[in-house]
């Protein structure tokens, strides 16, 4: 977790759901082989109205150009940020229920929307999170998700899926397939026949298996994979 100070009395003001892009704040630092700044998108995990700070959740990938740079920063150092980069403009009660199928650090956009639902007493949208990881130690924001589901079980539920589970693990294992999705979405009736939206975010291989390669930021493209098998429509993903 990286916490950045904002000017006193100000907040990020980002829309839900949206991201921002980061680069090194000093010219000449963290550049590619053409001398251009390395730029990476991240989704903040602090709510847009939180004053005085902005928090990013970043996984350390060895050899990652910007990852190595940001993990080398010290307290008091800065990062150049620009945004927002809008994704899905969240509207309370637009859908009866939503499903999130995510992997790794792809969980941060889901957390941004879940926080928005939780913070709005008028938003009755029900939400299911399917979060795939390799090991139990890889689960980001686990406590936050479990606390949310425990506090409002009638509105939120969480399913962790592990590829390499520890002994005694009771949750789903292996890859996220149609059976895992169908079972997880059953409680809140998140079915193709209902008023639903499914959000998918994670490594390219996972995204392709779940819904097919995305055409653009705002266009799913042809729907294939697990969600197509379950008869969801392109407009629902």
List PLM regions with ranges.
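Structural motif
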Residues: 97-99, 128, 197
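Short coil/loop residues immediately preceding or within conserved phosphate-binding loops
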Residues: 39, 95-96
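Hydrophobic/small residue at the entry helix of a nucleotide-binding pocket
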Residues: 105-110, 206
């Amino acid at each position: 977790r990286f916490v950045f100070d904002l000017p006193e009395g100000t907040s990020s003001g980002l829309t839900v759901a949206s991201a921002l892009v980061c680069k090194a704040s000093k010219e000449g630092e963290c550049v590619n082989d053409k001398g251009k700044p390395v730029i990476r998108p991240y989704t903040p995990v602090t709510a847009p109205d939180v004053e005085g700070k902005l928090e990013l959740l970043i996984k350390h990938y060895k050899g990652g150009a910007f990852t190595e740079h940001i993990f080398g920063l010290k307290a008091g150092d800065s990062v150049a940020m620009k945004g927002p980069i809008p994704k899905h403009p969240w509207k309370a009660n637009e859908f009866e229920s939503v499903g999130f199928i995510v992997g790794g650090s792809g969980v941060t956009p889901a957390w941004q929307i879940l926080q928005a639902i939780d913070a709005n007493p008028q938003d009755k949208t029900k939400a299911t999170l399917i979060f795939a990881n390799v090991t139990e130690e890889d689960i980001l924001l686990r406590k936050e998700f479990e606390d949310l589901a425990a506090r409002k079980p009638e509105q939120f539920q969480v399913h962790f899926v592990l590829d390499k589970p520890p002994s005694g693990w009771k949750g789903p294992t292996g890859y996220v397939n149609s059976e895992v999705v169908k079972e997880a979405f059953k409680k809140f009736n998140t079915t193709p026949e209902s008023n639903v939206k499914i959000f998918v975010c994670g490594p390219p291989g996972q995204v392709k298996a779940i819904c097919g390669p995305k055409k653009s930021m705002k266009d799913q493209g042809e729907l294939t994979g697990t969600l197509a098998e379950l008869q969801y429509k392109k407009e629902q993903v």
